[in-house]
């Protein structure tokens, strides 16, 4: 679908021990994102995908690491599908087309380092 709803920022998260998966909540028919950190050198964002929600194919100018937090999703990179489950990670290379489709409800952390 590509409709992403943004939740509140990260100021309330500093110097606290928290469960990463709890930082973005599911919403029916939506993808929810919450930016945890934003610096000139990169970002950390948590996503919560409702069942069957997807980010359509796109590219990014930097490598990005996706870390499964809950559920599972199919991550397509340059036409090849990879099943990402809670506890798994995958690196999406810079400038390669990629997409994310939830298989059931799915949460992930996305870490992008700008270099």
Each model region followed by its residue ranges:
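A short, N-terminal "cap"/entry segment at the start of jelly-roll beta-barrel domains
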Residues: 1-41
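Conserved short histidine dyad/triad with adjacent acidic residue
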Residues: 30, 43-60
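Structural motif
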Residues: 43, 72-74, 81, 97, ...
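Short, conserved beta-strand element in jelly-roll/cupin
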Residues: 48-50, 60-75
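A cytosolic small-molecule/anion-sensing beta-strand core signal
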Residues: 69-70, 85-86, 104
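Short acidic-glycine-tyrosine-enriched beta hairpin
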Residues: 79-94
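Ligand-binding loop in jelly-roll beta-barrel domains
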Residues: 94-115
């Amino acid at each position: 679908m590509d409709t992403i709803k943004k939740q509140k920022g990260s100021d309330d998260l500093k110097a606290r021990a928290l469960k990463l998966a709890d930082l973005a909540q599911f919403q029916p028919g939506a993808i929810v994102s919450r930016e945890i950190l934003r610096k000139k050198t990169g970002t950390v964002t948590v996503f919560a995908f409702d069942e069957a929600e997807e980010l359509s194919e796109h590219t990014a100018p930097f490598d990005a690491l996706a870390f499964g937090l809950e559920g599972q999703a199919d991550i397509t990179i340059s036409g090849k599908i990879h099943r990402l489950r809670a506890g798994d990670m995958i690196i999406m290379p810079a400038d390669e087309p990629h997409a994310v489709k939830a298989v059931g409800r799915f949460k992930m952390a996305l870490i992008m380092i700008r270099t």
